[in-house]
Amino acid sequence: MASDHQTQAGKPQPLNPKIIIFEQENFQGHSHELSGPCPNLKETGMEKAGSVLVQAGPWVGYEQANCKGEQFVFEKGEYPRWDSWTSSRRTDSLSSLRPIKVDSQEHKIILYENPNFTGKKMEIVDDDVPSFHAHGYQEKVSSVRVQSGTWVGYQYPGYRGLQYLLEKGDYKDNSDFGAPHPQVQSVRRIRDMQWHQRGAFHPSS
């Protein structure tokens, strides 16, 4: 018989999402645990988010309440201070969160130069791409079609800059995925059960 957390194939089942927000850095001070969407962290009594511990994820956090503003992807791991979950270093504000649904082992994404899925395109299947330029794609990214899997796009190569969560579906222009400009230069898959010791995704050098 399979155990509680094992499927018949022996693969671990996804755990219920769980994230703990601390008011101070290094997991100090008042804390609040979430297992579902939180449109406004302040309504839980938290003045600010100084550090984050993801026990089961992944999650996406937002700079503003009601899932607006800059996005931050959190995978299972420790985030001892705000600059461990953002490399854009534009804001230390974290005001709302929700779990990310990861329901596909397959990953396929198509990025288009122009809005409405026109112009030059780049198709990526089951791979992480730290630099579009290295793959010969030097165009802007104005629209995106995610056919399977869940992805995160980054403003700059090497998984740096602003982050854009790309879930299954069509994004007709860059504002649909939260980008102020049609600039995405690296992309990676979000896979459940990943563990990042240092929190934010750090590619191996």
UniProtKB/Swiss-Prot annotation:
One of its GO terms (molecular function) is structural constituent of eye lens. Residues 102-106 are annotated as: Connecting peptide. GO terms for biological process: camera-type eye development; lens development in camera-type eye; visual perception. Residues 2-16 are annotated as: N-terminal arm. Pfam families: Crystall. Crystallins are the dominant structural components of the vertebrate eye lens. Belongs to the beta/gamma-crystallin family. This is Beta-crystallin B2. The lineage of its organism: Eukaryota, Metazoa, Chordata, Craniata, Vertebrata.
